[in-house]
Amino acid sequence: MNPNYEYDPQRVVYFGATDSRNKRVPFGIRALDRMRHTYVIGKTGMGKSTLLENMAIQDIQNGEGVCFIDPHGSTAEKLLEYVPESRIKDVVYFAPFDIEYPLGFNVMEDVGYDKRHLVVAGLMSSFQRIWVDAWSARMEYILQNVLLALLEYPGTTLIDVNRMLINKAFRQKVVEYVTDPIVKRFWVEEFAGYTDKYTKEATPAIQNKIGQFASNPLVRNIIAQPESTFDIREMMDTQKIFIVNLSKGRMGEQNADLLGSMLTTKIYLAAMSRAEDSTEKLSNLPPFYLYVDEFQSVVNASFANILSEARKYKLSLTIAHQYIEQVDEDIRAAIFGNVGSIITFRVGPFDAEVLKTVFEPTFYAEDLVNLGYTQIYLTLMIDGVGSKPFSAKTLPPVEHAPFDFAAQVVQESRATYSKPRAEVEKMISNIDLKLAPGGFEKPTNNKKKKKRNGNENQSAQKQESTKEKKTSKNGDESKSKPKAVFSKDGKSALRDALAEITRSVKSEKKDLQKGKENTAAYKQKQEESKQPPKPIKKEPAQEELNGEVSRESLEKLLNVEE
């Protein structure tokens, strides 16, 4: 915590001005009342972003802990310009499109047993919103069990979802760590019993969607790092400035929505972790102000919980979006049931009908749809009590700062919280190599195996080669084909083996010809010995050329290395 910082519950952040006795009087909201959250709604271009910018800039310059999640990018870049020199080292600038210096962010890192279902619920609701066309009950069921299992295994990331489905050795290793009996039963009894046909039908949709993120280096280099390079709880407790630039135009809408949703979940978990502190320690912790513009892009199942519980852990939310139908009914209920201050710019007819219950009888639906640029109606939390609705105008943008340390801020953040792209990609490649199929299996030496392929390791090949050399030197009379793959150093053994096979085949053919010439004598001989005729083994790869064995075919059969 900044030793010079002192929390002032009466500190006001200004955002509007109203007429009082023929004078234009600026007003704002006190720090203590901000803990009841602020909800901003209005059509695009009405001034919502400017309102949020003005509040965040004041927080930054007042030494507060701030997180601003911006889906457009313009506000995030503007905030960098207003960071004073004294706070340059306080900034964590998260711009995923800065592919040369990616931060590490693992949403699955260090999640306690009692928080795992919250993380999974948040991820599942995000996936469902992003993959609405491909979502199914079966996909949800399997993916949920994948995530719950991976959360129990140390060092896993979202990239491991596909590895869990296709790498049997990795899957078995993860299941060994699972302690949740329901999750373990799914993998041991249910998934293990799936037929190949069913598995091929059930899992490709998940692999395809997760694979889209895994194949994009912009996202992969962030979410595939096992350890996050920043600590959100530490940010909250030490009043850091966390600026998140999720410009959809530069990184894609789905990528921005996924990262924003995961960040929101982790911020909530970080705030919840304050519950583990003593009452005395919690009372001394500073507040943390979270701004989310176009919040419907990052909303997930945990958002309703954030609105209802965050105040207890000194997490204040200021959220903005364009119209009510962008969020589900349960989120709407959480907003109007928990938010203390509601600010509306001009809205459409549907939103006006919903909001009139808040503003009538002072303002009616037709008033809400006719507001001008920067004009607002609001009900404000004042000393813990909601005010009557009143009208105002938002303040103009904050004047340009007399300083501009934006470049230094970005450079300092890179040096502290990012890693060079080459280093990150090498680390991810090493992890992939370590966890590749067979990575968890000990090398086996199966002497009964007759077929060898190019995927077998060299040590097994050398063992078989040595075995065949010894067999050849000892004059083994067996007529079965050699199993080994001979190298250049084994040419002598190869010649002996070829000669032995040639003699063997010639001898057998000679015996067969002799038997044909004297069939009666041949049969009598067999009856006396009471042994069935010994069949001549003929391998599919062997050929006859005028009674001689093709040396080329034998070499091909023995897989000779030239």
PLM features: residue spans?
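Conserved P-loop NTPase motor module
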Residues: 1, 16, 162, 173-178, ...
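P-loop NTPase motor domains
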Residues: 5-24, 31-46, 51-312, 368, ...
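Short beta-strand elements
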Residues: 28, 234, 394-396
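Conserved ATP-driven motor cores of ASCE-family P-loop NTPases powering translocation/secretion/packaging/pilus
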Residues: 83, 111-117, 306-389
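Residue-level detector of flexible, active-site-proximal loop/helix-junction positions
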Residues: 98-100, 324, 349, 399
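Extended hydrophobic-aromatic, low-complexity segments
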Residues: 253-256, 271-280, 300-303, 315, ...
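Short amphipathic C-terminal alpha-helix that caps PH/PH-like domains
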Residues: 259-267, 355, 359, 396, ...
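Intrinsically disordered, low-complexity RNA-associated tracts
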Residues: 438-562
